[in-house]
Amino acid sequence: LAKPVEIVGVACGEGARNKGCEAGPDAVRASGLVSRLQMRGLSAAWHETIRPAQAGYDDSLQAVESVCRRLAQRARAIVAHGGLPVVIGGDHSCAIGTWKGVACALRARGPLGLIWIDAHMDAHTPQTTPSGALHGMPLACLLGHGDSGLTALGGGIALQSQYVCLIGVRSFETSEAALLRQLGVRIY
């Protein structure tokens, strides 16, 4: 029996320079994704759309950390109850919350592997990023490098570098490649 597909929207563009991506989850939901999955025989439900609080953040880092904390809790609960979390963002900083939650739920089973299919490495840290955009940092955070508030989510390091590989990378900065090489991450 297939796992139930449990969709979580993350309407957050705080990690990107262009915040328009925050409209993505609402557009995907309005397109009828859930009903189309159900018509194909899948058990599917849209649980919620996580949004940054309207006020109270001094900067985008605080907003992203809050959103990722809530997303990690939701992803962990979905996996713990036998579901398959499908996260629709927003900017790519949502990968931090997604995989922190999944890793936390599966930690007792052993190391988690990740195949990162992306044109970008997303392995910047606050010290190496030319843009300052958090959506360029999720893989580094998942490997324990970056802002301490983000790396500590979900109990610390989510991934061990020997179980991570990147596919499809075509655009990156030398500092990202250096970090991943130092960690032993495979890049194809």
State what each model feature region is:
Residues 1-188:
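Conserved alpha-helical scaffold segments that buttress catalytic/binding sites
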